[in-house]
From Swiss-Prot:
Pfam families: His_Phos_1
Binding site for substrate: 9-16, 22-23, 61, 88-91, 99, 115-116, 159-160
Protein name as catalogued: 2,3-bisphosphoglycerate-dependent phosphoglycerate mutase
Domain of life: Bacteria
Annotated source species: Brucella melitensis biotype 2 (strain ATCC 23457)
Subunit structure: Homodimer.
PANTHER family with a match to the protein in the record: PHOSPHOGLYCERATE MUTASE (PTHR11931)
Length: 206
């Protein structure tokens, strides 16, 4: 038995491919995205993992990724909790815009600040700090208790919701977490100590 938490960013979405701000909008996966999600499941299977429960967001790109992984593991009917607490960062007025068009409208420097600062939200949206303010309490109250009961837990979510979770798990500074890129469909395996601190981290790259 081990206290195991696996984080996976959803496979490539149609809007990732088009370079659009996605946030809480709900585009589907590309063919590549479906393949990435299935490959993530295959790598987890090769690592000998089976899950006790899965969590995902209220957005279909994460839900489909989660299901592909469970299908590859032979666990298609596993209990899966869907909650908007795990949704991507809300990009507000930027949602649906091409990133180049956003730079033309607001200026490259301003868009860079919205994308890469920790606590400056775009108009009508969330900062990474805001995203963490909903993700981390949800993790502590809902997900972590399963891990500490020596269960193996899957979380299939989004680049920024997972970045906020990783920041708190690893005790990273805003500067450190903002430098981290999470590739689509790449599982990150955490083993936790009994006191909930991180014992080890492994990235299952292709």
């Amino acid at each position: 038995m081990s206290r195991t938490l696996v984080l996976v960013r959803h496979g490539q979405s149609e809007w990732n491919l088009k370079n659009l701000f996605t946030g809480w909008r709900d585009p589907g996966l590309t063919e590549q995205g479906h393949a990435e999600a299935k490959a993530a499941g295959q790598r987890l299977k090769a690592a000998g993992l089976k899950f006790d429960i899965a969590y995902t967001s209220a957005l279909s790109r994460a839900q489909v990724t989660c299901q592909h992984i469970l299908d590859e593991l032979g666990q298609p009917g596993l209990e899966t909790i869907r909650d908007q607490a795990l949704n991507e960062r809300d990009y507000g007025d930027l949602s649906g815009l091409n990133k180049d068009d956003a730079r033309a409208k607001w200026g490259e420097e301003q868009v860079h600040i919205w994308r890469r600062s920790y606590d400056v939200p775009p108009p009508g949206g969330e900062s990474l700090k805001d995203t963490g303010a909903r993700v981390w309490p949800y993790y502590l109250h809902t997900i972590q208790p399963h891990v500490l009961r020596e269960e193996t837990v899957l979380v299939a979510a989004h680049g920024n919701s997972l970045r906020a979770l990783i920041m708190a798990l690893e005790g990273l500074t805003p500067e450190q977490i903002l430098k981290q890129e999470l590739n689509t469909g790449v599982p990150i395996i955490y083993r936790l100590n009994a006191d909930s601190t991180v014992a080890s981290k492994e990235i299952l790259s292709a």
